[in-house]
């Protein structure tokens, strides 16, 4: 079986973790290789460029090779390359950014437009280069081995891929043909392909010339119509993909309501299995991670929940407004928090308040869920409704409702935690095996 991902993003990682945890194994393949794939994840680009099984470390930001007298200026977010007063390039870090490991470098022309992007891998060498035209459209992308030899050239205007492998040139009309060549070399069983994208992975499955039992895992929202490629699968009785697993509850119900009964049978729902990193001890320690001083009803909550302790952290300096809360006995502030202190807060706190305005910081809701924090949010600040109980998302106009919930929490926290695991997108190994067990491990 092949588990085929377009990108190894958060949702792909969640699906892969859920499958492996459930004992549903396959050869995981990622099409868009960013150079930092885990060792157990395959990629045709890594294979042909001989990146698999190598040793080395990511390139640190100040190790980028430069001409004489050029310099690098950086912080924990990004870095820039300067030629005296001229900015020549911008360095983007691999997550987590505080480690300052180089992932991509945009090199500018004299008009301050990106001329090309160098892509670095987890071994510290430039494994690919993307070229842009004057309108900033991608034209070609070249992939290299460790010695800088060009191995693959992909033309984004024509779709053609040229592979130089074992002193021979191979030409492919598109990525599907390229992937099929790679699969044939690997000798994998192609009778089952599980995939989570309606782009290249869909076409790999759709154009297979022999029978198989494939599954599409749909992880996105939909608008007012079902995507065309998904409709092709649902309306056909002879494609390899006869099952669509939707991984967002609301999207599942929406899609199902738009289908005739015979097509509804092809749709199923399955969330994700999330790690369970610690037991909740019912402590009255509340954690908030923010990049803003706009925290909904913070003053009221601190005043009325005096028997709770608020731990408020930020990766940056805090404003005077937020620092003023240091005078409160039940508040501890952590400006410029270190990773060690942040990890400790996940351990010592058992409640998370998602009440800060602005962007979610560092996927904190997901991490709080994994650490079994009971999560509460206001309706105008909730950053991840898939992991928060509906009953714990409070109207921002009724702060007293949250206060009352917290004052009466001690006897129900374990029950609510159980509900948080059962009624959100969290799944169990048993349900994964029940839904997918008949399809997997071929």
Curated annotation (Swiss-Prot):
Pathway: Protein modification; protein glycosylation. Coiled coil: none annotated. Its main location: membrane. Disruption phenotype: No glycosylation of serine-rich repeat protein Srr-2. GO terms for biological process: protein O-linked glycosylation via serine; regulation of protein stability. It is found in: Cell membrane. It is a peripheral membrane protein. Keywords: Cell membrane, Membrane. One of its GO terms (cellular component) is protein N-acetylglucosaminyltransferase complex. NCBIfam families: accessory Sec system glycosylation chaperone GtfB. Interacts with glycosyltransferase GtfA (Gtf1). Interacts with glycosyltransferase GtfA; probably forms a heterotetramer with 2 subunits each of GtfA and GtfB. Part of the accessory SecA2/SecY2 protein translocation apparatus. Required for the polymorphic O-glycosylation of the serine-rich repeat protein Srr2. A stabilizing protein that is part of the accessory SecA2/SecY2 system specifically required to export serine-rich repeat proteins, probably Srr2 in this organism. The GtfA-GtfB (Gtf1-Gtf2 in this bacteria) complex adds GlcNAc from UDP-GlcNAc to Srr2 substrate, attaching the first sugar residue. Stabilizes the glycosylation activity of GtfA in vivo. Belongs to the GtfB family. This is UDP-N-acetylglucosamine--peptide N-acetylglucosaminyltransferase stabilizing protein GtfB.
